Amino acid sequence: MEQKIFGQINQEESGSKKNIYLMQPTYMNSSSVHFPYAIGALASYAWQFDDIRENYALKKCFFLRNKTEEVLNSLENPFLIGFSCYMWNFEYNKLLAKKIKGRYPNCIIVFGGQHIAPGEENLIKYPFVDILMHNEGEVFFRDLLRALANGTQLKEVNNISFRENGQTVATPVTTAKDFNFPSPYESGFYDKLIEDNPNIEFIPLVETNRGCPNHCAYCSWGKMNAKVRLFPMDRVFRDLEWVSEHKMEFLGFADANFGMFPRDEQIIDKIIELYEKNGYPVKFQVSYSKNSEDRVFRITEKLNKKGMDKGVTLSFQSMSPTVQKNIGRSNMYIEHFKTLLDKYSQAGIPTYTDLILGLPGETLESFTDGIETLLEYGQHTSLFVHLCEWLPCAEMGKKEYMEYFGINYSKVPLNQPHMSRIENEEVGEFSRIITLTNSMSHDDWKKMNIFSACVLCFHHLGMLQIAALYIYHQKGIKYKDFYSSLAEYLLSSDGAASNALKKIKKRLDDIIEKNSAVVFFDDRFGNVAWPFEEYLFLDIITQKDLFFKQIKNFLSNYIDDDALLCELLAYQSFIIKQINVSHKSFSGSYNWKDYFGALLKDQKDAVLKKEKVHYVIDDNRAAVTWQEYARNVLWYGRRGGKNIYTSEIKEVIGDERE
C-alpha cells in the first residue's frame, strides 16, 4: 500500500462525521507493551473504504489501563466505541463501558475479541453492551459501520449478536472471503501511538498467517479459525521492514504453527537480512509447528546462529494418553522426542517443553510420572508448567464438557506472569484456574503445584540440577522421588528454601479457600509478577550460601561421602549466576565439568573421574542488582537456561592457573 491510510485521515476535519473510539487496554510489562494489534487490524481494514471515511472519524484508540474517569472525560460525543476483550482487560472494559453508557446513553457499545463466546449470554448479563462481535472482525466491523450509516438492518451483518424488540438476535458466524487485509503497521495506525508515547517500548506482533488446524479443547485458536490462510508475502515483508526500520528490539509472530509452510524459511531469511542490515529486530519469538520438524529445525538453526531465538518448543501439554484423548491432541512418540532433543542439543539450539497442570483426566501420579519421563529422556534445559485456565471460547469452556469431566475452577486475580502491578487499580482482572476435575482433587492440585515448583526451580532453573543428576545416575534414585522428598524435607524444616516453599504452600491453600493470586510480587525484584517457581528461585538465590548449608543435610541421605558431597555442592554453587560477580574460580578433585556436560547430553556411560581440576568463569555482563538479575538472567534468560553457566566454564591447565 503506497499511501498511509491514517496519515490521510489525521489531516481531515471530522466535521459532521460520527466519532468512533477503539479500546484494547492491557497491562505494562515493566516499560514495554504490545501494540494493540486487534483494533489496529480492524481500523486499518475499515478506514481504507471511502464510505467509512466519509461517515466516521476515528478519534482515538486506547491501549493502556488509564483511569476510567480520564478516558470518559476525553471522549467527544462518541457514536460507537469498540472494545477488544481478553481475560486481561474484560473487567476494566465492563467498568468503562458501563460508565460510558451512563454518560452517553445513545453511544453504541460493541464488545468483541477472544473473551466473547458465541451466543447472546453477554448481552443478557451486561445491559450496557449493545452488540457482540464474534470470531474475526475486520470485514464484519466494516459491515457493521456501513449498516449503521445506511440504516440497514443489523440482521444483514454476520458474526454479531444484538437486541431487537426485547429479544436477542444472533447472526450466522462465518469467515470472511476477503483476506486482503491491510497491515496496521503499513497503514500508519501506530505512528501516532509511537509519537505520543516516547518512553514506552512497543513490542510488535506480526501475522504471516491466520488459523490453526488443531482442535485442542483448552484453546480457542483452532475452534475459532480452523482453516489456515496466508497473508501475501509482500505484506509480510513490508511489515518486517517496518519493524526493523523503527528499531524494534523484540518481534513476535501471532502464527499458531510457524514453520508449517515452505515459505516460512524465506520469511526467516528476510528477518535475518534486516537484522544484518539495520541491527533490528534483535530477538524473535513464535509458536512453532509440531508437524514440520525438518523445516522448523532449519529455521531455528539459522536464528540460533545469529543469537536471535530463545529456543524451540517440543511440547506435550500432558504425557498421559488419557489426557491427550480428552483434549483432542496427539503427541509425538517419546522416542522421537528424544531424537529431536539430541538433534537440537548437538546443534547448540535450546529446547523447552510445555506442560499444562489441571487438564481433564490428569492424576497426581500421571503428572509426576510425566515429568519423570521428560527428565529421563533428557529434557534438562527448560520446562514450563502452565496452570490450566478456563476460556469461554474453548471447547473446555462448554457447560457439557465441564460437567462430563467434573471441571471446576477458582476465580483468582489475573494469572499473567511478569506483568506490572498497578497501584490503586480501579478494577482487577481474573483468571479461572482449573483446580478440580473427576481425576484430580483440590489436594492433588496443590501437591502437583508443589512438585512442579520444586522441579522447575531446583532442576530446570539449576539450583540443584547437578545434585539430582548425580543421584539419579550414581544412586539410581528417580527424579520424581528425589524432588518429592526434597519438597517434604523443606516443608518440614526451617531455613532459606523452606520459608519460600511454605509461603507457596500457604498460597495454594488460599487459592482454593480465598481465590488468592497465583503469582507473587516482591519489591526486591521489581514491579513484576513472578510465577511460583521463579519466586522460589529468586528468594533462595538471595541467600544462596545459607541454602546450600541447609540442603547439605538433605543430600547426605543420598551421598555418604562427605568430602565428595561438599565438593559437589561447591561446584553446583559455582555454576549458578550471581549479582556483582564477573569472575569466579573453582578447584576440585573430580572432572565435574566433563562429567555433567556428558550427562546433560544424555551420555549415560559418562564416568566421574578423580582428577585435579581448576575452572574459571568470566562474565562481563553480570547483573549488579537483584532487579536486573531477576529481569535479564531469570525472566529473559530462562528459555535458554541462561541462569546457570555452561559453555562459559573454562578449564585452566597447569601454569595457567591463578
Spans of model-derived segments:
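Radical SAM [4Fe-4S] cluster-binding motif and immediate context
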Residues: 183-347, 357
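A general structural detector for well-ordered alpha-helical segments in enzyme core domains, enriched
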Residues: 42, 71, 92, 96-100, ...
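Glycine-rich beta-alpha loop elements in corrinoid/cobalamin-binding modules
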Residues: 45, 54-173
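Conserved C-terminal portion of the radical SAM core fold
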Residues: 80, 108, 237, 242-254, ...
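Short hydrophobic segments within beta-strands
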Residues: 23-25, 84, 112, 254
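Glycine- and acidic-residue-enriched helix-capping/strand-helix junction motifs
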Residues: 28-42
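Radical SAM enzyme core and accessory elements
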Residues: 1-22, 31-32, 53, 73, ...
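N-terminal [4Fe-4S]-dependent radical SAM core
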Residues: 2-21, 28, 163-205
